[in-house]
Design a protein with these regions (language model features):
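His/Met- and acidic-residue-enriched segments that coordinate or traffic transition-metal cofactors
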Residues: 2-9, 14-192
Length: 192
């Protein structure tokens, strides 16, 4: 009888240990990953499938937060007036877009990231280490790359999103992002 009790205790302890190690493997500190996981779980419970619209909302929110953080750095460390003016435009336009997206997400029960994703935070950290012309150039390079991705993302959502509110948000925001991309490309030509 004692042997059975011991075997049961060892089996339970082994299962608990395995469950704990599984949680550590799947647990993430990446806010974007956590938001996507939460949305996937909600969508699976509601419909049995994942939703690309939720993924768009998470990517858009993360991109907006990145541009706000980088613009704050430019306010502190930027040298060129055209770069500072662009960053000020980023602050104004992306604050407005972020607020609108948060309102839509609240109505749709979409979980947005609470902070930057790990990859985006690396960009902020790398830029924060730079100064002078090197800082301005790196910021401009990041903004060109980021806005090229954003324009593609928002165009796809404006064309293909199932949710009418997210589709309208993407269509409404797309011209602003295209304007940003044109402007930052002009700055990029003049920065060398």
């Amino acid at each position: 009888m004692k042997k059975i009790g011991l075997i049961l205790a060892l089996a339970i302890a082994s299962l608990n240990f395995q469950a704990c190690s599984e949680n550590k493997k799947s647990g993430s500190t990446d806010s974007v990953e956590n938001a996507n996981d939460a949305n996937d779980e909600k969508e699976k419970q509601a419909t049995g499938e994942d939703d690309d619209d939720n993924e768009f909302a998470v990517k858009a929110a993360n991109g907006g937060m990145l541009e706000m953080e980088l613009a704050r750095l430019v306010r502190e460390k930027g040298q060129r007036s055209d770069v500072k003016e662009f960053a000020a435009m980023m602050m104004a336009d992306h604050q407005k877009a972020n607020d609108e997206l948060k309102a839509i997400a609240g109505r749709k029960n979409i979980t947005l990231p609470a902070r930057l994703g790990d990859d985006e935070q690396k960009h902020v950290d790398e830029l924060a280490k730079l100064s002078g012309t090197e800082f301005d150039k790196k910021y401009v390079d990041l903004m060109v790359d980021d806005h090229e991705k954003d324009v593609k993302l928002f165009k796809e959502a404006a064309d293909d999103a199932d949710d009418a509110d997210l589709k309208a948000f993407a269509a409404k925001t797309l011209p602003t992002l295209q304007k940003h991309l044109e402007r930052i490309k002009m700055i990029d030509k003049n920065i060398d």
